[in-house]
Amino acid sequence: MKQGIHPDYREVVFQDSSTGFQFLSGSTATSDETVEWEDGNTYPLIRVEITSDSHPFYTGKQKFTQADGAVDRFNKKYGLSND
């Protein structure tokens, strides 16, 4: 592996902007902001819009309205029933 061409891989804290949920993970992302983690160490803070704490797939608040409409149109077009 060539030296000096790869970004630094280190532990960073990701924070969900909508819920405030934070988790520690490894990343090459950089940030000027830092935060003190539960272990007492200071890590770079990366703010993200969506995490597993706020994404509808993980929270169970999914909406399938668009997909359901497509299925209904298909069934109607080909004379199929939804049973």
Curated annotation (Swiss-Prot):
Q: Print the keywords alphabetically.
A: Ribonucleoprotein, Ribosomal protein
Q: Spell out the Pfam families in the cross-references.
A: Ribosomal_L31 (PF01197)
Membrane-crossing residue ranges in chain numbering: none
Q: Which GO terms describe its cellular component?
A: ribonucleoprotein complex; ribosome
The family database entries (Gene3D superfamilies) matched by this protein are listed as: Ribosomal protein L31
Q: Which GO BP terms apply?
A: translation
Which Gene Ontology molecular function entries are recorded, alphabetically?
structural constituent of ribosome
Q: Which family does it belong to?
A: Belongs to the bacterial ribosomal protein bL31 family. Type B subfamily.
Assembly and interaction partners: Part of the 50S ribosomal subunit.
> What protein does this entry describe?
Large ribosomal subunit protein bL31B
